UniProtKB/Swiss-Prot annotation:
GO terms for biological process: 'de novo' IMP biosynthetic process. This is Bifunctional purine biosynthesis protein PurH. The gene is purH. Belongs to the PurH family. GO terms for molecular function: IMP cyclohydrolase activity; phosphoribosylaminoimidazolecarboxamide formyltransferase activity. It comes from Bacillus cereus (strain AH187). Residues 1-145 form the MGS-like domain.
């Protein structure tokens, strides 16, 4: 019996050449709507779906393949005598190939002016039904949903006269991944439209961006996936201009650096190591900002990741060229800057739109046996809600330093302490199990620069010991959430040493 293929695609990439190859193998082709028209315009002989179903396409194409003559031909088990007898009795012919991809729901809802009605109209019904039927019966049916697989199928047909069983299984698995992702997009869209924040089930879909050499360590396998609607201001959508492929650790560090530099509207540069900032500087231009970020910690910046929120110019590139760096990420690089930096063949140069999100996206964290979901911490300092419980208020310069330190501390692993002075960080204490331990690290790193600096803490002081350490180091201003039952003890210490202290009422733990 002559083999038959059903072809109905929204993505027309390569379909004419593929169908031509099928016809050359003696395979009869059935098609629908726009696909049929395209194939016929290219001189290919195909059969209309209505000739198979004996029923016209109706309801603006909503119903065309939902018919027993189609699904019987797809689902029939060819070595089952009962199935074969029923097919013969009802005049159903088998379908051996299904070439289908689905209505462009993702592309539709990505449009800024999309209406709810447009989105609903682009939910495919017949397509998923066909490919699921074919994939279930993959022992007898080859189902192709991705143009990438056209050449594989044709090559096996030309070589063996049939598609290998292993290939059919792989294609079937791809179908169910495809429909699962498609349905996840639809369910998430409708859930968001209804304003449901914590649905009873959560289905997420990501698209592979690249395989990675390894994970956090060489013995760990890893892959990088991107969210279908991730912000363009993200590492997932960055353009790599130069250098080696990004590693797992590179991606984590670049993401951390990008998150911090987005906090600033003035020219800013952030240096990151192991997802913690080691130096942050702001200035009147990007060269000045980089100089301050470098001077913040000239030791730790070696082998680090740099993020800037302005174009990298030649003079800044020349300074960057002087040290070993893994990545530089910026909105753009001048032609002269690229010439300087591309002389380092392994240095990764990325461009990305630097834009702070105004809405909190969801942050997913895997734990053993489950998944934690929360809003991203995008909250900025609200000066209308702060309080100053100390006798002295911060000076103008102290306010500048406090604000810089507060922007940075929310991105440091808790317990977190950041010291800032003269438009740059001068000490970062990260990830200690007690707050005073982080303070001591930051103060030690700052050395003599701690005198007259500002301190930010991501959470309140449970005891006044951190204030005591700050006072001994000559720190003159502190910003912290407040809210401890021992706040009064800290306020007394601050007043004793003439320290200005600001309560924000907002905690910024980061784990």
């Amino acid at each position: 019996m002559k083999q038959r293929a059903l072809v109905s695609v929204s993505d027309k990439t390569g379909v004419v050449e593929f169908v031509k190859g099928l016809l050359e193998q003696g395979i009869e082709v059935i098609s629908t709507g726009g696909t049929k028209k395209l194939l016929e315009e290219n001189g290919l002989q195909v059969i209309g779906i209505s000739e198979v179903t004996g029923f016209p396409e109706i309801m603006d194409g909503r119903v065309k393949t939902l018919h027993p003559n189609i699904h019987g031909g797809l689902l029939a088990v060819r070595d089952n005598e009962t199935h074969v007898a029923q097919m013969n009795e009802l005049g159903i012919e088998p379908i051996d190939f299904v070439v289908v991809n689905l209505y462009p729901f993702k592309e539709t809802i990505a449009k800024p002016d999309v209406t709810f009605a447009d989105a609903i109209e682009n939910i495919d019904i017949g397509g998923p039904t066909m490919i699921r039927s074919a994939a279930k019966n993959h022992k007898f049916v080859s189902v192709i949903v991705d143009p990438v697989d056209y050449d594989v199928v044709l090559a096996e047909l030309e070589e063996n006269g049939e598609v290998k069983e292993e290939t059919k299984r792989k294609l079937a698995a791809k179908v169910f991944r495809h429909t699962a992702a498609y349905d996840a997009l639809i369910s998430n869209y409708l859930t968001e439209q209804m304003g449901e924040e914590s649905p009873e089930t959560l289905t997420v879909t990501f698209e592979k961006k690249q395989d990675l050499r390894y994970g956090e360590n060489p013995h760990q396998k890893a892959t990088f996936y991107k969210a279908p609607f991730a912000a363009t201001s993200s590492v997932a959508y960055a353009e790599q201009l130069h250098g080696k492929e990004l590693s797992y650790n590179n991606i984590n560090d670049a993401d951390a650096a990008l998150s911090i530099v987005k906090e600033f509207t003035e020219p800013a540069v952030v240096a990151v190591k192991h997802m913690n900032p080691c130096g942050v500087g702001v200035g009147t231009d990007i060269h000045e900002a980089y100089t301050r970020a470098y001077e913040a910690d000239p030791v730790s910046i070696f082998g680090g990741i740099i993020a800037a929120n302005r174009e990298i110019d030649k003079s800044t590139a020349e300074k960057l060229h002087e040290i070993f760096l893994e990545i530089i990420i910026a909105p753009s690089f001048s032609k002269e800057a690229l010439e300087v930096l591309q002389s380092k063949k392994n240095l990764r140069l990325l461009t990305v739109n630097i834009e702070k999100s105004t809405s909190a996206s969801k942050k997913l964290t895997s734990v053993q046996g489950g998944l934690l979901v929360q809003e991203e911490d995008t909250l900025s300092l609200d000066e209308s809600t702060i309080s100053i419980p100390t006798k002295r208020e911060p000076s103008e310069q102290e306010w500048k330093d406090l604000k810089l330190a507060w922007k940075v501390v929310k991105h440091v692993k808790s317990n977190a302490i950041v010291l800032a002075k003269d438009d740059m960080t001068i000490g970062v204490g990260a990830g200690q199990m007690n707050r005073v331990g982080s303070a001591k690290i930051a103060i030690t790193q700052a050395g003599e620069k701690a005198q007259g600096s500002a301190l930010a803490s991501d959470a309140f002081f449970p005891m006044p010991d951190t204030l005591e350490e700050a006072a001994k180091a000559g720190i003159t201003a502190i910003i912290q959430p407040g809210g401890s039952i021992r706040d009064e003890d800290s306020i007394k210490v601050a007043d004793t040493y003439g320290i200005a202290m600001v309560f924000t009422g907002v905690r910024h733990f980061k784990h």
